[in-house]
């Protein structure tokens, strides 16, 4: 519970301040549009995974066991893997109650393509009855089809870091559709990101917010990594495991106290996924 609370208050809320400041500008430069998209990617991850962790913690307190809903999605090497790690409960629901009843992948290629597109149309519609969510869902449906039928062998030959970077880029584009309330604004933002709108490459506000939040964004990126798994691969893992018995409770306590302090001193506390 404390870990989820800290994710929400310390990381998601701070990312939210960055996105709100940038979206409040009269216009965005290329650099500003990328900074907003990256900050929002971390905001929605720590926001949703944060209160998912809080729900798991509350369940443990009352003797219930809930499955993990997020499994470090930003280390995914493909979009397919991303959706096995992101919002696992939603993906499981659509797989069990839509994809498999339609025949799943046990049918011919044409029907398999149809099934995937139906699932992702409904996934987009589940988030909201507006064009940006429909396009968001079909965008992922198209990406999954490309990976499944065209890029599977190629991705196996590429270094892991290249696959992770390209997957994060594709996910970042998807979050732009998610961020805006209408499709035209999302498309304009993407045009700015890729230098297709005539916007300036950078601007003083983008530089300011980047410099003042660089350490925080690096911290958010590091917090997205599975450190427990990574540390278990080190030769000194036994020593680290022994130290973890008292270091982890100490870190969690400090994070919780910092979160309480931030809640008391700040009024900014949105819950993004509550609107879905």
Q: Locations of the language-model features?
A:
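Membrane-embedded transmembrane alpha-helical bundles that form the catalytic cores
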Residues: 1-275
